[in-house]
Amino acid sequence: VDTTAKLALLADAAKYDVACTSSGIDRDARMGALGNATAAGICHSFSADGRCITLLKVLFTNVCVFDCAYCASRCSNDVPRTSFRPRELADLTMEFYRRNYIEGLFLSSGVLKSPDYTTERIIECLRILREEYGFRGYIHAKAVPGTSSDLLAALGLLADRISVNMELPSSESLALLCPNKTRDSIVAPMRQIREGIAEDRDTRALMRRDACYMAQRRPARKTRAFAPAGQSTQMIIGATPETDFQILNLSSSLYKTMHMKRVFFSAYLSVNEDGRLPQGNAVQLDREHRLYQADWLMRFYKFDAAELIDEGQPFLATDIDPKANWAINHLDRFPIEVNTAPYEELLRVPGIGVRGAKAIVGARRATALGEAELRKLGVAYKRARFFITCRGRYQGHGTRFDKESLHAQLAAPIQAGSHGRRSGKVLAGQMSLFDGIG
Protein backbone atom coordinates (compact mmCIF):
# COMPACT_ATOMS: atom_id res chain seq x y z
CA VAL A 1 0.00 0.00 0.00
CA ASP A 2 1.45 3.39 -0.93
CA THR A 3 1.81 6.20 1.57
CA THR A 4 -1.12 8.20 0.20
CA ALA A 5 -3.50 5.26 0.61
CA LYS A 6 -2.18 4.59 4.11
CA LEU A 7 -2.73 8.20 5.10
CA ALA A 8 -6.28 8.22 3.75
CA LEU A 9 -7.12 5.12 5.80
CA LEU A 10 -5.30 5.99 9.02
CA ALA A 11 -6.31 9.66 9.10
CA ASP A 12 -9.95 8.62 8.72
CA ALA A 13 -9.59 6.07 11.53
CA ALA A 14 -8.13 8.76 13.82
CA LYS A 15 -11.21 11.00 13.64
CA TYR A 16 -12.84 9.15 16.56
CA ASP A 17 -10.14 10.37 18.94
CA VAL A 18 -11.06 13.82 20.26
CA ALA A 19 -8.22 14.30 22.74
CA CYS A 20 -6.64 17.28 21.03
CA THR A 21 -5.85 20.34 23.10
CA SER A 22 -3.59 23.35 23.25
CA SER A 23 -0.12 22.64 24.56
CA GLY A 24 0.65 25.64 26.74
CA ILE A 25 4.41 25.31 26.17
CA ASP A 26 6.84 27.84 24.74
CA ARG A 27 9.57 26.05 22.83
CA ASP A 28 10.49 28.39 19.97
CA ALA A 29 12.28 27.98 16.67
CA ARG A 30 16.04 27.46 16.66
CA MET A 31 18.79 27.81 14.08
CA GLY A 32 19.28 24.51 12.26
CA ALA A 33 15.97 23.06 13.50
CA LEU A 34 12.47 22.96 12.08
CA GLY A 35 9.13 23.93 13.60
CA ASN A 36 8.26 25.55 16.88
CA ALA A 37 5.72 25.10 19.64
CA THR A 38 5.68 28.66 20.94
CA ALA A 39 2.36 29.10 22.75
CA ALA A 40 1.23 26.25 20.58
CA GLY A 41 -2.31 25.03 20.25
CA ILE A 42 -3.46 22.05 18.29
CA CYS A 43 -6.06 21.02 15.78
CA HIS A 44 -9.18 23.15 16.02
CA SER A 45 -8.06 24.69 19.29
CA PHE A 46 -6.58 28.03 20.24
CA SER A 47 -3.20 28.92 21.66
CA ALA A 48 -2.50 31.44 24.40
CA ASP A 49 -1.91 34.17 21.79
CA GLY A 50 -5.15 33.42 19.94
CA ARG A 51 -3.73 31.38 17.07
CA CYS A 52 -5.50 28.29 15.78
CA ILE A 53 -3.07 25.71 14.46
CA THR A 54 -3.47 22.26 12.98
CA LEU A 55 -1.93 18.86 13.55
CA LEU A 56 -1.58 15.84 11.36
CA LYS A 57 -3.98 13.63 13.30
CA VAL A 58 -3.37 10.02 12.37
CA LEU A 59 -3.04 6.47 13.63
CA PHE A 60 0.33 4.76 13.40
CA THR A 61 -1.59 1.57 12.61
CA ASN A 62 -5.19 0.38 12.62
CA VAL A 63 -4.06 -3.20 13.13
CA CYS A 64 -5.11 -4.12 16.65
CA VAL A 65 -4.96 -7.24 18.79
CA PHE A 66 -7.49 -5.73 21.23
CA ASP A 67 -11.23 -6.21 20.78
CA CYS A 68 -12.93 -3.16 22.35
CA ALA A 69 -16.64 -3.39 21.52
CA TYR A 70 -17.09 0.22 20.35
CA CYS A 71 -13.88 0.60 18.32
CA ALA A 72 -13.86 0.62 14.52
CA SER A 73 -10.36 -0.92 14.54
CA ARG A 74 -11.13 -3.83 16.89
CA CYS A 75 -9.57 -7.11 15.86
CA SER A 76 -12.91 -8.82 15.16
CA ASN A 77 -13.88 -6.25 12.50
CA ASP A 78 -13.27 -7.10 8.86
CA VAL A 79 -11.80 -3.79 7.69
CA PRO A 80 -8.80 -2.80 5.55
CA ARG A 81 -5.64 -2.75 7.70
CA THR A 82 -2.35 -0.98 7.28
CA SER A 83 0.56 0.48 9.23
CA PHE A 84 3.13 3.19 8.70
CA ARG A 85 6.83 2.50 8.93
CA PRO A 86 8.50 4.85 11.45
CA ARG A 87 10.54 6.74 8.86
CA GLU A 88 7.63 6.81 6.44
CA LEU A 89 5.43 8.66 8.94
CA ALA A 90 8.29 10.95 9.97
CA ASP A 91 8.90 11.85 6.32
CA LEU A 92 5.18 12.41 5.77
CA THR A 93 4.97 14.72 8.77
CA MET A 94 7.92 16.76 7.52
CA GLU A 95 6.45 17.00 4.02
CA PHE A 96 3.18 18.39 5.34
CA TYR A 97 5.04 20.73 7.67
CA ARG A 98 7.12 22.12 4.80
CA ARG A 99 3.93 22.67 2.79
CA ASN A 100 2.54 24.63 5.76
CA TYR A 101 -0.39 22.22 6.06
CA ILE A 102 0.37 21.37 9.69
CA GLU A 103 2.34 22.60 12.68
CA GLY A 104 2.57 19.37 14.61
CA LEU A 105 1.54 15.74 15.01
CA PHE A 106 -1.18 13.99 16.97
CA LEU A 107 -0.31 10.30 16.95
CA SER A 108 -2.53 7.51 18.24
CA SER A 109 -2.42 3.84 17.34
CA GLY A 110 -3.98 0.43 17.40
CA VAL A 111 -2.05 -2.29 19.20
CA LEU A 112 0.26 -4.00 16.71
CA LYS A 113 1.45 -7.35 18.13
CA SER A 114 1.79 -5.99 21.67
CA PRO A 115 1.76 -2.65 23.55
CA ASP A 116 5.57 -2.66 23.81
CA TYR A 117 6.14 -3.46 20.14
CA THR A 118 3.74 -0.69 19.10
CA THR A 119 5.35 1.84 21.43
CA GLU A 120 8.83 0.95 20.17
CA ARG A 121 7.72 1.76 16.62
CA ILE A 122 6.15 5.06 17.71
CA ILE A 123 9.29 6.01 19.65
CA GLU A 124 11.44 5.34 16.59
CA CYS A 125 9.20 7.59 14.48
CA LEU A 126 9.41 10.42 17.02
CA ARG A 127 13.16 9.92 17.45
CA ILE A 128 13.65 10.40 13.71
CA LEU A 129 11.55 13.57 13.81
CA ARG A 130 13.28 15.07 16.82
CA GLU A 131 16.89 13.93 16.44
CA GLU A 132 17.46 13.38 12.73
CA TYR A 133 15.13 16.02 11.29
CA GLY A 134 15.38 18.54 14.14
CA PHE A 135 11.59 18.90 14.33
CA ARG A 136 10.59 21.18 17.21
CA GLY A 137 6.87 21.39 16.51
CA TYR A 138 4.18 20.09 18.84
CA ILE A 139 3.79 16.31 19.24
CA HIS A 140 0.96 14.66 21.16
CA ALA A 141 1.43 10.89 21.51
CA LYS A 142 -1.06 8.38 22.81
CA ALA A 143 0.40 5.81 25.21
CA VAL A 144 -0.86 2.25 24.81
CA PRO A 145 -2.17 0.67 28.05
CA GLY A 146 0.20 -2.10 29.09
CA THR A 147 3.35 -0.39 27.80
CA SER A 148 6.44 -1.01 29.95
CA SER A 149 7.66 1.81 32.19
CA ASP A 150 11.01 2.14 30.35
CA LEU A 151 9.31 2.70 27.01
CA LEU A 152 6.82 5.12 28.52
CA ALA A 153 9.72 7.11 29.97
CA ALA A 154 11.38 7.24 26.54
CA LEU A 155 8.12 8.33 24.90
CA GLY A 156 7.76 11.18 27.39
CA LEU A 157 11.14 12.61 26.38
CA LEU A 158 10.09 12.83 22.73
CA ALA A 159 6.46 14.02 22.97
CA ASP A 160 5.16 17.34 24.28
CA ARG A 161 2.02 15.74 25.63
CA ILE A 162 1.18 12.12 26.42
CA SER A 163 -2.31 10.81 26.96
CA VAL A 164 -3.69 7.48 28.13
CA ASN A 165 -7.37 7.03 27.36
CA MET A 166 -9.53 6.30 30.40
CA GLU A 167 -11.97 4.87 27.82
CA LEU A 168 -14.98 4.37 30.11
CA PRO A 169 -16.07 5.87 33.45
CA SER A 170 -16.09 2.67 35.54
CA SER A 171 -14.15 -0.56 35.98
CA GLU A 172 -17.33 -2.56 35.36
CA SER A 173 -17.93 -0.93 31.98
CA LEU A 174 -14.29 -1.34 31.05
CA ALA A 175 -14.46 -5.07 31.80
CA LEU A 176 -17.65 -5.37 29.74
CA LEU A 177 -16.58 -3.48 26.62
CA CYS A 178 -12.76 -3.63 26.74
CA PRO A 179 -11.85 -7.19 27.81
CA ASN A 180 -8.16 -6.66 26.97
CA LYS A 181 -7.78 -3.62 29.22
CA THR A 182 -7.93 -3.21 32.99
CA ARG A 183 -8.26 -0.12 35.13
CA ASP A 184 -4.75 -0.71 36.49
CA SER A 185 -3.24 -0.91 32.99
CA ILE A 186 -4.67 2.57 32.37
CA VAL A 187 -4.08 4.21 35.76
CA ALA A 188 -0.51 2.90 36.21
CA PRO A 189 0.92 4.78 33.17
CA MET A 190 -1.04 7.89 34.19
CA ARG A 191 0.64 7.71 37.58
CA GLN A 192 4.06 7.23 35.98
CA ILE A 193 3.53 10.21 33.68
CA ARG A 194 2.47 12.37 36.64
CA GLU A 195 5.57 11.36 38.60
CA GLY A 196 7.84 11.82 35.58
CA ILE A 197 6.57 15.35 35.00
CA ALA A 198 6.97 16.24 38.69
CA GLU A 199 10.48 14.77 38.86
CA ASP A 200 11.56 16.61 35.71
CA ARG A 201 10.15 19.89 37.02
CA ASP A 202 11.87 19.51 40.39
CA THR A 203 15.18 18.52 38.82
CA ARG A 204 15.17 21.52 36.51
CA ALA A 205 14.31 23.84 39.40
CA LEU A 206 17.30 22.52 41.36
CA MET A 207 19.56 22.88 38.33
CA ARG A 208 18.50 26.50 37.84
CA ARG A 209 19.46 27.25 41.44
CA ASP A 210 22.83 25.58 41.09
CA ALA A 211 25.58 28.06 40.27
CA CYS A 212 27.68 25.51 38.38
CA TYR A 213 24.73 24.56 36.22
CA MET A 214 23.90 28.17 35.46
CA ALA A 215 27.48 28.72 34.32
CA GLN A 216 27.12 25.82 31.86
CA ARG A 217 23.42 26.26 31.02
CA ARG A 218 23.89 26.62 27.25
CA PRO A 219 24.78 22.95 26.58
CA ALA A 220 22.40 21.79 29.30
CA ARG A 221 19.44 23.43 27.53
CA LYS A 222 19.57 20.67 24.92
CA THR A 223 18.19 18.20 27.45
CA ARG A 224 14.56 17.48 26.59
CA ALA A 225 11.87 17.93 29.21
CA PHE A 226 9.53 15.07 30.08
CA ALA A 227 6.07 15.69 28.56
CA PRO A 228 6.32 19.48 29.06
CA ALA A 229 2.69 20.00 28.02
CA GLY A 230 1.45 17.47 30.58
CA GLN A 231 -1.03 14.64 30.14
CA SER A 232 -4.68 14.34 29.16
CA THR A 233 -7.24 11.58 28.83
CA GLN A 234 -10.53 10.77 27.12
CA MET A 235 -13.78 9.04 28.14
CA ILE A 236 -16.59 7.73 25.98
CA ILE A 237 -20.00 8.76 27.27
CA GLY A 238 -23.32 7.17 26.42
CA ALA A 239 -22.01 3.68 25.64
CA THR A 240 -22.56 2.59 29.24
CA PRO A 241 -25.06 3.62 31.95
CA GLU A 242 -22.83 5.88 34.08
CA THR A 243 -24.38 9.21 35.03
CA ASP A 244 -22.98 12.70 34.60
CA PHE A 245 -22.56 12.72 38.38
CA GLN A 246 -20.19 9.75 38.16
CA ILE A 247 -18.37 11.15 35.13
CA LEU A 248 -17.76 14.61 36.61
CA ASN A 249 -16.60 13.19 39.92
CA LEU A 250 -14.15 10.94 38.08
CA SER A 251 -12.99 13.92 36.01
CA SER A 252 -12.50 15.98 39.17
CA SER A 253 -10.53 13.16 40.76
CA LEU A 254 -8.26 12.87 37.71
CA TYR A 255 -7.45 16.59 37.83
CA LYS A 256 -6.60 16.38 41.52
CA THR A 257 -4.75 13.07 41.67
CA MET A 258 -3.19 12.74 38.21
CA HIS A 259 -2.71 16.47 37.55
CA MET A 260 -4.43 16.17 34.19
CA LYS A 261 -4.24 19.13 31.86
CA ARG A 262 -7.51 18.12 30.24
CA VAL A 263 -10.18 15.43 30.41
CA PHE A 264 -12.02 14.95 27.12
CA PHE A 265 -15.50 13.54 26.62
CA SER A 266 -16.53 11.77 23.45
CA ALA A 267 -20.21 11.07 22.81
CA TYR A 268 -20.64 7.42 21.86
CA LEU A 269 -20.95 6.94 18.12
CA SER A 270 -22.26 3.61 16.86
CA VAL A 271 -19.82 2.05 14.39
CA ASN A 272 -20.20 -1.64 15.31
CA GLU A 273 -23.00 -4.18 15.71
CA ASP A 274 -22.63 -5.60 19.21
CA GLY A 275 -25.17 -6.73 21.79
CA ARG A 276 -23.18 -5.06 24.57
CA LEU A 277 -23.66 -1.63 23.02
CA PRO A 278 -26.69 0.72 23.03
CA GLN A 279 -29.14 0.24 20.20
CA GLY A 280 -29.85 3.05 17.74
CA ASN A 281 -27.75 5.76 16.16
CA ALA A 282 -28.43 8.69 18.51
CA VAL A 283 -25.28 10.67 19.30
CA GLN A 284 -25.49 12.51 22.63
CA LEU A 285 -23.69 15.67 21.52
CA ASP A 286 -25.86 17.86 23.75
CA ARG A 287 -24.83 15.83 26.80
CA GLU A 288 -21.18 15.93 25.71
CA HIS A 289 -21.32 19.70 25.37
CA ARG A 290 -22.80 20.20 28.84
CA LEU A 291 -20.09 17.97 30.33
CA TYR A 292 -17.44 20.13 28.67
CA GLN A 293 -19.07 23.25 30.11
CA ALA A 294 -19.15 21.73 33.61
CA ASP A 295 -15.54 20.61 33.21
CA TRP A 296 -14.58 24.17 32.22
CA LEU A 297 -16.25 25.52 35.35
CA MET A 298 -14.24 23.12 37.50
CA ARG A 299 -10.96 24.00 35.80
CA PHE A 300 -11.20 27.77 35.57
CA TYR A 301 -14.07 28.98 37.76
CA LYS A 302 -13.23 27.12 40.98
CA PHE A 303 -16.47 25.13 40.99
CA ASP A 304 -16.50 21.76 42.68
CA ALA A 305 -18.27 18.83 41.02
CA ALA A 306 -20.61 18.59 44.02
CA GLU A 307 -21.81 22.16 43.36
CA LEU A 308 -22.81 21.38 39.79
CA ILE A 309 -24.49 18.01 40.19
CA ASP A 310 -25.57 15.52 42.85
CA GLU A 311 -26.95 12.02 43.17
CA GLY A 312 -30.50 13.36 43.43
CA GLN A 313 -30.22 14.85 39.93
CA PRO A 314 -27.38 12.83 38.39
CA PHE A 315 -27.59 14.28 34.86
CA LEU A 316 -26.82 17.83 33.75
CA ALA A 317 -29.74 19.78 32.32
CA THR A 318 -29.54 20.01 28.54
CA ASP A 319 -31.81 23.06 28.20
CA ILE A 320 -29.64 25.38 30.31
CA ASP A 321 -25.89 25.62 30.83
CA PRO A 322 -24.41 24.40 34.15
CA LYS A 323 -23.33 27.83 35.38
CA ALA A 324 -26.75 29.39 34.81
CA ASN A 325 -28.40 26.34 36.35
CA TRP A 326 -26.23 26.71 39.47
CA ALA A 327 -27.05 30.41 39.71
CA ILE A 328 -30.83 30.03 39.54
CA ASN A 329 -30.61 27.33 42.21
CA HIS A 330 -28.65 29.67 44.50
CA LEU A 331 -30.61 32.90 44.23
CA ASP A 332 -29.85 33.62 47.89
CA ARG A 333 -26.34 34.63 46.72
CA PHE A 334 -27.62 37.18 44.21
CA PRO A 335 -27.78 39.89 43.08
CA ILE A 336 -24.24 41.09 43.75
CA GLU A 337 -22.87 44.60 43.32
CA VAL A 338 -20.31 44.58 40.50
CA ASN A 339 -18.49 47.59 41.91
CA THR A 340 -17.65 45.90 45.21
CA ALA A 341 -18.06 42.12 44.82
CA PRO A 342 -14.90 40.01 45.19
CA TYR A 343 -13.40 38.44 42.07
CA GLU A 344 -14.51 34.96 43.20
CA GLU A 345 -18.15 36.08 43.39
CA LEU A 346 -18.01 37.77 39.99
CA LEU A 347 -16.86 34.46 38.48
CA ARG A 348 -20.13 32.88 39.61
CA VAL A 349 -22.30 35.30 37.62
CA PRO A 350 -23.64 33.90 34.32
CA GLY A 351 -22.30 36.05 31.50
CA ILE A 352 -19.11 37.03 33.33
CA GLY A 353 -16.06 34.97 32.43
CA VAL A 354 -12.53 34.92 33.76
CA ARG A 355 -11.36 37.79 31.56
CA GLY A 356 -14.53 39.74 32.25
CA ALA A 357 -14.17 39.36 36.01
CA LYS A 358 -10.53 40.46 35.89
CA ALA A 359 -11.46 43.43 33.70
CA ILE A 360 -14.20 44.48 36.13
CA VAL A 361 -11.84 44.34 39.10
CA GLY A 362 -9.32 46.47 37.24
CA ALA A 363 -11.74 49.00 35.73
CA ARG A 364 -13.74 49.72 38.88
CA ARG A 365 -10.63 51.14 40.55
CA ALA A 366 -10.92 54.12 38.23
CA THR A 367 -14.69 54.57 37.91
CA ALA A 368 -18.03 53.18 39.01
CA LEU A 369 -19.30 50.67 36.46
CA GLY A 370 -22.70 50.64 34.79
CA GLU A 371 -24.28 48.86 31.83
CA ALA A 372 -22.25 50.71 29.19
CA GLU A 373 -18.95 50.02 30.93
CA LEU A 374 -19.76 46.33 31.43
CA ARG A 375 -20.59 45.89 27.76
CA LYS A 376 -17.29 47.54 26.79
CA LEU A 377 -15.45 45.15 29.10
CA GLY A 378 -16.85 42.16 27.21
CA VAL A 379 -19.44 41.05 29.75
CA ALA A 380 -22.46 39.19 28.29
CA TYR A 381 -24.75 41.78 29.82
CA LYS A 382 -27.99 40.18 28.58
CA ARG A 383 -27.27 37.20 30.83
CA ALA A 384 -25.42 38.87 33.67
CA ARG A 385 -28.02 41.58 34.31
CA PHE A 386 -30.35 39.22 36.19
CA PHE A 387 -27.72 38.60 38.87
CA ILE A 388 -26.08 42.00 39.42
CA THR A 389 -26.60 45.51 40.64
CA CYS A 390 -24.70 48.52 39.34
CA ARG A 391 -24.32 51.44 41.74
CA GLY A 392 -27.01 49.83 43.86
CA ARG A 393 -29.59 49.45 41.07
CA TYR A 394 -30.81 45.99 40.04
CA GLN A 395 -30.21 45.41 36.32
CA GLY A 396 -32.75 42.67 35.63
CA HIS A 397 -35.79 44.93 35.75
CA GLY A 398 -38.86 43.58 33.98
CA THR A 399 -38.16 39.96 35.00
CA ARG A 400 -39.29 38.39 38.24
CA PHE A 401 -36.40 37.31 40.44
CA ASP A 402 -37.45 33.68 40.84
CA LYS A 403 -36.21 30.36 39.54
CA GLU A 404 -38.92 29.80 36.93
CA SER A 405 -38.72 33.27 35.39
CA LEU A 406 -34.93 33.28 35.23
CA HIS A 407 -34.85 29.77 33.79
CA ALA A 408 -37.12 30.94 30.98
CA GLN A 409 -34.76 33.85 30.26
CA LEU A 410 -31.55 31.79 30.35
CA ALA A 411 -32.68 28.53 28.75
CA ALA A 412 -30.47 27.72 25.77
CA PRO A 413 -31.19 24.34 24.13
CA ILE A 414 -28.22 23.25 22.04
CA GLN A 415 -29.41 20.30 19.95
CA ALA A 416 -30.28 22.45 16.96
CA GLY A 417 -27.42 24.89 17.44
CA SER A 418 -23.80 24.92 16.43
CA HIS A 419 -22.83 22.91 19.51
CA GLY A 420 -24.97 20.04 18.23
CA ARG A 421 -22.63 19.35 15.34
CA ARG A 422 -19.06 18.14 15.33
CA SER A 423 -17.11 17.23 12.24
CA GLY A 424 -15.59 14.11 13.72
CA LYS A 425 -18.98 12.75 14.77
CA VAL A 426 -21.71 13.83 12.40
CA LEU A 427 -19.56 14.49 9.37
CA ALA A 428 -16.37 12.80 8.28
CA GLY A 429 -14.86 16.24 8.54
CA GLN A 430 -11.10 15.85 8.93
CA MET A 431 -9.71 18.12 6.25
CA SER A 432 -8.13 16.59 3.21
CA LEU A 433 -4.36 16.75 3.23
CA PHE A 434 -4.12 15.91 -0.46
CA ASP A 435 -5.66 18.99 -2.06
CA GLY A 436 -3.16 20.74 -4.24
CA ILE A 437 -0.59 17.95 -4.21
CA GLY A 438 0.36 17.09 -7.74
Predicted regions and their residues:
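Flexible, acidic/Gly-rich N-terminal and inter-domain linker regions that tether
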Residues: V1-V63, A380, I388-T389, G396-G438
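Conserved, mostly hydrophobic/aromatic
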Residues: L55, C68, L107, V164, ...
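Local cysteine-cluster metal-coordination motifs and their immediate loop/turn environment
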Residues: N62-R74
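Core AdoMet radical
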Residues: R74-L89, F96-I122, I128-S149, G156-Q216, ...
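Flexible glycine/acidic-rich beta-alpha junction loops that bind and position SAM and/or redox cofactors
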Residues: D116, P169-C178, T203-E242, K261-L285, ...
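Catalytic cores of alpha/beta
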Residues: T147-L158, T240-K256
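Long, highly charged, low-complexity intrinsically disordered interaction regions
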Residues: E273-L347, Y381-G420, G424-G438
